[in-house]
Amino acid sequence: MEKIMSNKFNNKVALITGAGSGIGKSTALLLAQQGVSVVVSDINLEAAQKVVDEIVALGGKAAANKANTAEPEDMKAAVEFAVSTFGALHLAFNNAGILGEVNSTEELSIEGWRRVIDVNLNAVFYSMHYEVPAILAAGGGAIVNTASIAGLIGIQNISGYVAAKHGVTGLTKAAALEYADKGIRINSVHPGYIKTPLIAEFEEAEMVKLHPIGRLGQPEEVAQVVAFLLSDDASFVTGSQYVVDGAYTSK
């Protein structure tokens, strides 16, 4: 990460979940570089603090927060932490998630289904439920939800994940309509297979074949799209689904 070079976001405050690694981390670093005060939230506080230390060492503003996004009270506390630490909340990137069990629908356990829905869908609702009032109180802002290409198409053997991400897509659209005239823009980002810990267990060569571009995506490439959607450059963009997938879904 380069030293802080701009104040493009005019001293805005952002809450990012799942920010201890992968796309969330890359987005936290990029936003900090552009002058955003970032709450780096993750279920792994040590990982979150490492990201904060990196940001602060380079002249940015950040604070670590431990939160299990599947627990409503944790998200309430995360939003309160953002406001108490930096004075307001203007931006949110609801990014935390898990892949869950890889099994056919009949073999997917009930517990596995509930967990993947809770972490990937319910958690986004819990997050927005508490973020929206804070953002309204700050005079408006923007939210981006991570929904994956699995929120647009079917993928076998991860039915719970696919269902959850389709739910995030729908939730994003509904909320965008509710707050379009109230000063909050809400969009979703839909990455293909990105080189993050989420897909570390899979064979990379096989995943590369799924993308006509001939490679996997990098977290920084998704972060650039998220930063755009959170910025005033996207002032007329709300209720949209931004696909970052190397043409995966164009086949």
UniProtKB/Swiss-Prot annotation:
Class of this enzyme: oxidoreductase
Tagged with keyword Phosphoprotein: no
Pfam families found in the cross-reference section: adh_short_C2
Molecular-function GO terms, alphabetical: oxidoreductase activity
Disruption phenotype: Mutant accumulates cyclohexanol.
Keyword NAD listed: yes
Active-site residues per Swiss-Prot or TrEMBL entry: 161 (proton acceptor)
Keywords: NAD, Oxidoreductase
Entry superkingdom: Bacteria
Enzyme Commission (EC) number: 1.1.1.245
PROSITE patterns registered for this protein in UniProt: ADH_SHORT (PS00061)
Reaction(s) catalysed (UniProt annotation): cyclohexanol + NAD(+) = cyclohexanone + NADH + H(+)
Binding site for NAD(+): 42, 95, 161, 165, 194, 196
UniProt cross-references to PANTHER family, sorted A to Z: DEHYDROGENASES, SHORT CHAIN, ESTRADIOL 17-BETA-DEHYDROGENASE 8-RELATED
Protein family: Belongs to the short-chain dehydrogenases/reductases (SDR) family.
Function: Catalyzes the oxidation of cyclohexanol to cyclohexanone. Required for the conversion of cyclohexanol to adipic acid.
Protein name per UniProt: Cyclohexanol dehydrogenase
Record organism: Acinetobacter sp. (strain SE19)
